[in-house]
């Protein structure tokens, strides 16, 4: 009887642990919020760096993006972190007010930044400009990092962003795109998740219903 009670308690703890995970600070499609302070890292799977110039040639700089298999990922050990860093050259006369990454349709995301970029290696540095807010499009494909208002909070000439982070439940990736926005849009090569698992809403619903059903069945068994 004691063993049954212990099993019942463990089942309850497991279900509430999942509920706590499900209510974590996850950026759902259509949502806007404050960025989380995250700690990406792990095994570097791929990286890209390059130069960029906006369409009116009033601004230019460098960018770096990478994918890590993260043992401490929000969604599961080994799931993928997508990270980005932008530098605006000192001779630019315009500022980067926003960036967006695509395509994250069908994946769960926890979005924010880390001020400790150099800990990642791969050329990342400890940038100084943090996003004011993060958002996700209604369809879930686009993840945005906004640095304004005020304009003084943008990635101004001579400045480098903190490392911007999108933790996901993806386990595979492919080529994607990253946009730098100052009124116009400059698009550069990046990475995106691939081979989506069960869509997030369905996954949560199915697991939640299953957990309730199991708990109910166990309770009836123990009572009887």
Question: Can you describe what each PLM-predicted range is?
Answer:
Residues 1-2, 216-218:
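Short alpha-helical segments used as structural interaction elements across diverse proteins
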Residues 25-196:
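Extracellular or exported targeting regions of proteins
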Residues 18-24:
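Sec/Tat signal peptide C-region and signal peptidase I cleavage site
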Residues 220-224:
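Short, charged juxtamembrane terminal tails flanking transmembrane helices
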Residues 1-9:
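Bacterial N-terminal signal peptides that target proteins for export
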Residues 199-217:
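A short, hydrophobic C-terminal helix/tail in secreted or cell-surface proteins
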């Amino acid at each position: 009887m004691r063993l049954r009670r212990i099993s019942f308690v463990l089942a309850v703890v497991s279900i509430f642990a999942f509920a706590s995970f499900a209510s974590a600070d996850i950026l759902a499609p259509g949502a806007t919020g404050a960025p989380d302070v995250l700690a990406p890292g792990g095994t570097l799977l791929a990286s890209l760096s390059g130069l960029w110039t906006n369409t009116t040639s009033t601004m230019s700089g460098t960018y770096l993006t990478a994918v890590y298999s993260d043992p401490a990922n929000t969604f599961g050990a080994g799931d993928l972190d997508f990270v980005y860093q932008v530098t605006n050259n000192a001779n630019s006369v315009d500022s980067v007010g926003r960036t967006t990454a695509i395509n994250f349709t069908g994946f769960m995301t926890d979005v924010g930044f880390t001020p400790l970029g150099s800990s990642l290696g791969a050329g990342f540095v400890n940038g100084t400009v943090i996003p004011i807010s993060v958002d996700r499009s209604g369809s879930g494909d686009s993840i945005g990092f906004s640095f304004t208002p005020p304009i003084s909070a943008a990635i101004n000439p001579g400045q480098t962003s903190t490392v911007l982070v999108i933790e996901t439940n993806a386990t595979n990736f492919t080529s994607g795109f990253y946009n730098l926005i100052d009124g116009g849009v400059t698009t550069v090569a990046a990475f995106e998740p691939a081979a989506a698992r069960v869509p997030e809403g369905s996954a949560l619903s199915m697991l939640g219903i299953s957990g309730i059903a199991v708990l109910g069945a166990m309770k009836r068994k123990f009572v009887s």
